[in-house]
């Protein structure tokens, strides 16, 4: 038998869920990499730390050189950053022919990355949505991406798996999203 609380007291209740910290609900700013190139070094090191087991990400200097190409302003690749004030949160890019073995697939969403401390805030979703808006603005008919493990996330937004294949030492799903027409 459990004892009733003394008169004037209420039984202990589960604590109410605390609201998200203010920084978790502030708008996420997406800017072209060209507007904040000072983040290239931080981004290159973060990508290397996360993906260094895979060939494109094994060398910080090559990563920096890739992002320097995104600054040229002559078509793709184009990259965007998610920032909070002066702090880098993540990145995404539009590029051509991301998997050389698949030359028939021209336009790709790639390099979608959120720094560990910014995960769970919707940063990746905002980056992808922004990249899709830019792809539509550019008139791209369709986009492809590859992922080893988050197919379900992209499927919720209309991406369809078209094949699985080995790439950079892992099995990935190649996915497609039609943007214009019936490509």
What positions do the PLM features span?
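A short beta-loop-alpha structural element at the N-terminal edge
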Residues: 27-43
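Conserved GNAT-fold acetyl-CoA-binding loop/helix
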Residues: 45-69
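Short, often N-terminal, low-complexity regions
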Residues: 2, 19-26
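Conserved beta-strand in the GNAT
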Residues: 79-81, 87-97, 108, 113
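Conserved acetyl-CoA-binding loop-helix of GNAT-fold acetyltransferases
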Residues: 111-114, 120-133
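Conserved active-site tyrosine of GNAT-family acetyltransferases
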Residues: 154, 159
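C-terminal "cap" of GNAT-fold acetyltransferases
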Residues: 42, 141, 145-151, 163-183
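Short loop/turn motifs at secondary-structure junctions and domain boundaries
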Residues: 70-75
């Amino acid at each position: 038998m459990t004892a009733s609380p003394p008169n004037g007291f209420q039984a202990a209740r589960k604590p109410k869920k605390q609201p998200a910290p203010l920084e978790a609900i502030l708008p996420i700013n997406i800017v072209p990499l060209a507007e904040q190139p000072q983040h290239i070094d931080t981004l290159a090191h973060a990508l290397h730390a996360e993906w260094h087991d895979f060939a494109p990400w094994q060398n910080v200097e090559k990563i920096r050189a890739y992002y320097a190409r995104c600054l040229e302003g002559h078509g793709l690749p184009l990259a965007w950053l998610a920032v909070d004030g002066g702090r880098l949160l993540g990145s995404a890019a539009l590029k051509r022919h991301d998997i050389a073995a698949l030359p028939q697939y021209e336009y790709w969403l790639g390099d979608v990355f959120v720094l560990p401390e910014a995960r769970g805030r919707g940063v990746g979703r905002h980056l992808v949505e922004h990249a899709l808006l830019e792809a539509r603005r550019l008139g791209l008919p369709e986009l492809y991406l590859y992922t080893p493990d988050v197919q379900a996330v992209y499927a919720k937004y209309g991406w369809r798996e078209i094949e699985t294949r080995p790439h950079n030492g892992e099995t990935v799903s190649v996915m497609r999203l039609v943007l214009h027409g019936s490509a």
